[in-house]
From Swiss-Prot:
InterPro entries: A-amylase/branching_C, Branching_enzy, GlgB, GlgB_N_E_set_prok, Glyco_hydro_13_cat_dom, Glyco_hydro_13_N, Glyco_hydro_b, Glycoside_hydrolase_SF. This is 1,4-alpha-glucan branching enzyme GlgB. Keywords: Carbohydrate metabolism, Glycogen biosynthesis, Glycogen metabolism, Glycosyltransferase, Transferase. The active site is at D315 (nucleophile), E366 (proton donor). Pfam families: Alpha-amylase (PF00128), Alpha-amylase_C (PF02806), CBM_48 (PF02922).
Length: 649
C-alpha cells in the first residue's frame, strides 16, 4: 500500500503526510485522508482513512459490505488516523464510518474528507476520486498572475447558485444550467466577477450554505464537480472571475457529520462555551488545534487548486477573532482582552500560505468591526486579507436612502462619513444578500417614496457606489430592482422584467457596470490619496454631494454630482479643478433608464467665479433624486484652479 500511495502523491511518504497533518501544515490533506484508489487498476479497490483519535473502534460500512462491521479499520495511534484497504469497493458506491466513540456509543458518521456526497436529504459519502480535468483557461490565469488587482476594476455579482433561476417545473438550476445561462448574462451585464454563496455540502438549504458538513465537496444538489469545473473554465474564457464564500469559523451541529466526531471535542473547542455558537446554532472550530488547521487550510487549497477559483470571501471573520462576538458566556484571553488569539493567528497563517501559493487570488473578509486591521500585510500588523467588506458604508447609506428627503439635510454625514476612512482598509462596498431577507425588504423596497422615485433613488444609490472608492458587490436581482425579498428556495422574480421600469433599471445597471470598467479614474489609482477629491460634502441645505475621481493623467478625471432630494437643482454651481469645458457623460434620469430626460445637459464652460477653494466653477442642472457625471472636454491642465489641492501626474 505504501508504494502505491507514494506513487500517487509524488515521493511523500505516508508518515510524512501524517506528521504534517499533526503539525498543522498539511495543505493537501485531500490527497491523503478520505477515499483513494489503491492503485491505478480499477479493480484494486480503495483505501479509506479518517481522523478520529479518541474513538475506540471505527468500521467502514457501505454498499460493498452490506453496511455491516466486516471491515474494521486500523488505528495509527501516533496520528489518530484510522485506515483500511477495501478491495471490494468500487466507484460510486455509498459509504459511511461507524464510529465507536470514546463513551462506547456507536454512531454512523459521514466522511469529512469526501469529495462527493449522496444527494440530500441522504448523507452518505460516495466512493469517488476526481479525475483529471482538461482546463482551457491558461490565458486567463496567466493574466491574473501578472495583474495588480488593486489597480483594476472589480465589480462582483453575488449569487446563490440554486435560486438564481428555476425551471418551469419549479426545480432549481444546477451548474450545468448556470453555465449555459448565467455566464452570458453576467458578461452582458458587465460584471468582472461572480461570487457564490457557499457551494460546499450542507444539509439544510435554509442555512444558505453557511452551516457546512462537507468542506471538500460541491453540494450534491448543485451538480457534479466536473460541471462546476466546466462552469469556471467557461467563465475564465469569457474574462469572468469566480469567487466562493468559505466558512472556516463554524460548522453544522448535525450529529452524523463533524460534531464531536469521536465522542470528544474533535474539530470543536474543548471548552463547551467556546465550542457552542449560540447565535447560529452551530459549533465553532478549534482554530488552535493543528489537525483542524490542516483540515481547513486543505479545504481552501482544494477549492483554489482543483477548481481554479480566483479567490474566496471568508465568512464571519468577527466570530473568529473576538471571544465576545457570540451570545452567551465568554472568557477573556491570557492578556485579559476579547481577542481570540488562536483565530487571529490562524487567519494570518491562512492568508500567508494562500498568498504564497496563489498571490493572484482575491481573499476577502466579511468583517464588521473597526478594532482590528483586517486588510494589508501581516508584517504591518494586519490579518493579511486583500479586502474587507465595508459594512459601515452599507449600513449608513441604506439608512440614508430609506429616509424621507426632508430629514436628509441633517443626516448628510451618513453618505459623506466614509470619505473620512475610505483608506483605512482595502474595502469592498457590499449590497449583499444579508440586506434583502428577514423582513429587511429588497433594495428597491427600501427606497423612499412612490415607485417612480424608488427607481430614481436606486439608480442614484448604485451610481454613488460605483463612483465611491473601493471595489463593488451587488446581490442578484438588485440589478433590476426586484421588489420582493430574496427567497432561498425559489428562483428570482424574472417576470419583473416584463415591466418596462424593471427592464430599464436592468439596462441602467448594465450601462453603469460597463462605464465603471471603461473609466480608469474609478480604479487605476486604487487607494492612493489622489484618486478622491471632495468638492463639496457640506451642502446640507440642497442635500447635494459633489466629488471628483482622478486617474493617473491630469486630464483623466470624473466629476460626480448627486442630488438626494426630489427637487431639481437648476443652475447648480460647483468648483472645477481646471478652466475649460465639461461635458455630461452619464445622467441617471435619462428616459432610457426609466427617467424623464430626453437629452443631456449642455456642455458647461467654466467661469472665474470662486467656489469654496476653487478659482473656477461651472453651473449645470442636477435632476431630482438623480446623479450626473461630467468629464473634461477641453481644459487647460497647465494651471490648476484649486488653491489647496495639487494633483500630481
Amino acid at each position: 500500500m505504501a508504494v502505491n500511495t507514494e506513487e500517487r502523491h509524488g515521493q511523500e511518504s505516508l508518515e510524512n503526510h501524517k506528521h504534517m497533518f499533526n503539525q498543522g501544515v498539511n495543505y493537501e490533506l485531500y490527497n491523503f485522508l478520505g477515499v483513494h484508489k489503491i492503485s491505478r487498476d480499477d479493480e484494486s479497490g480503495y483505501v479509506f482513512r479518517v481522523w478520529a483519535p479518541h474513538a475506540k473502534q471505527v468500521w467502514v460500512c457501505g454498499d460493498f459490505n452490506n453496511w455491516d462491521k466486516s471491515h474494521p479499520m486500523i488505528l495509527d495511534e501516533k496520528s489518530g488516523i484510522w485506515s483500511i484497504e477495501v478491495k471490494e469497493s468500487r466507484e460510486n458506491q455509498y459509504y459511511k464510518y461507524l464510529v465507536k466513540q470514546a463513551n462506547g456509543r456507536e454512531i454512523m458518521k459521514t466522511d469529512p474528507m469526501a469529495q462527493v456526497y449522496e444527494k440530500r436529504p441522504e448523507t452518505a459519502a460516495v466512493v469517488k476520486e476526481l479525475e483529471p480535468f482538461k482546463w482551457n483557461d491558461g490565458l486567463w490565469r496567466g493574466r491574473q498572475k501578472r495583474m495588480n488587482h488593486f489597480n483594476n476594476p472589480i465589480n462582483i455579482y453575488e449569487v446563490h447558485a440554486p435560486s438564481w433561476k428555476e425551471h418551469e417545473d419549479g426545480s432549481l438550476y444546477t451548474f450545468k444550467d448556470l453555465t449555459a445561462e448565467l455566464i452570458p448574462y453576467v458578461k452582458k451585464m458587465g460584471y468582472t466577477h461572480i461570487e457564490f454563496m457557499p457551494l460546499m455540502e450542507h444539509p439544510l438549504p435554509a442555512s444558505w450554505g453557511y452551516q457546512l458538513t462537507g468542506y471538500f465537496a460541491l453540494c450534491s444538489s448543485y451538480g457534479t464537480p466536473d460541471e462546476f469545473k466546466d462552469f469556471v473554465n467557461e467563465c475564465h474564457q469569457n474574462n469572468i472571475g469566480v469567487l466562493v464564500d468559505w466558512v472556516p469559523g463554524h460548522f453544522s451541529i448535525n450529529d452524523d457529520a463533524l460534531a464531536y466526531y469521536d465522542g470528544t471535542p474533535t474539530y470543536e473547542y474543548e471548552d463547551p462555551d467556546r465550542a457552542k455558537n449560540i447565535g447560529w446554532g452551530a459549533l465553532n472550530f478549534d482554530l488552535g488545534k493543528p489537525e483542524v488547521q490542516s483540515f481547513l487550510l486543505s479545504s481552501a487549497f482544494y477549492w483554489l487548486n482543483e477548481f481554479h477559483l480566483d479567490g474566496m470571501r471568508v465568512d464571519a471573520v468577527s466570530n473568529m477573532i473576538y471571544l465576545d462576538y457570540d451570545e452567551g458566556p465568554w472568557k477573556p484571553n491570557k492578556y485579559g482582552d476579547t481577542r481570540n488569539l488562536e483565530g487571529y493567528a490562524f487567519l494570518q497563517k491562512f492568508n500567508k500560505v494562500v498568498k504564497f501559493a496563489h498571490p493572484e487570488s482575491l481573499i476577502i473578509a466579511e468583517e464588521s468591526s473597526s478594532g482590528t486591521q483586517i486588510s494589508g500585510t501581516i508584517e504591518s500588523g494586519a490579518i493579511g486579507f486583500d479586502y474587507k467588506w465595508n459594512m459601515g458604508w452599507m449600513n449608513d447609506v441604506l439608512e440614508f436612502f430609506e429616509m424621507d428627503p426632508y430629514f436628509r439635510k441633517d443626516n448628510l454625514n451618513l453618505v459623506t462619513f466614509s470619505f473620512m476612512y475610505w483608506q483605512a482598509e482595502n474595502f469592498v462596498l457590499p449590497l449583499s444578500h444579508d440586506e434583502v431577507v428577514h423582513g429587511k425588504k429588497s433594495l428597491m423596497h427600501k427606497m423612499w417614496g412612490d415607485r417612480y422615485r424608488q427607481f430614481a433613488q436606486l439608480r442614484t444609490l448604485y451610481t454613488f457606489m460605483m463612483m465611491h472608492p473601493g471595489k463593488k458587490l451587488l446581490f442578484m436581482s438588485g440589478e433590476w430592482g426586484q421588489f420582493l425579498e430574496w427567497k432561498f428556495d425559489h428562483g428570482l422574480e424574472w417576470v419583473d422584467l416584463q415591466d418596462e421600469m424593471n427592464a430599464k433599471m436592468q439596462h441602467f445597471t448594465s450601462v453603469l457596470n460597463h462605464f465603471y470598467k471603461e473609466e480608469r479614474p474609478l480604479w487605476e489609482l486604487g487607494q492612493q490619496d489622489a484618486t478622491l477629491e471632495v468638492i463639496d460634502a457640506d451642502n446640507h441645505n440642497d442635500t447635494v454631494l459633489s466629488f471628483i475621481r482622478h486617474g493617473k493623467r491630469k486630464k483623466d478625471f470624473l466629476i460626480v454630482i448627486l442630488n438626494f432630494t426630489p427637487v431639481e437643482r437648476r443652475n447648480f454651481r460647483i468648483g472645477v479643478p481646471y478652466e475649460g469645458t465639461y461635458t455630461e457623460i452619464l445622467n441617471t434620469e435619462m428616459k432610457e433608464f426609466g427617467g424623464t430626460w430626453v437629452e443631456h445637459n449642455a456642455d458647461s464652460v467654466s467661469e472665474e467665479v470662486n467656489f469654496k477653494d476653487y478659482e473656477h466653477s461651472i453651473t449645470t442642472t442636477v435632476p431630482a433624486l438623480g446623479a450626473i457625471i461630467l468629464k473634461p472636454k477641453d481644459i487647460k491642465v497647465t494651471r490648476r484652479s484649486s488653491k489647496k489641492h495639487s494633483h500630481k501626474k
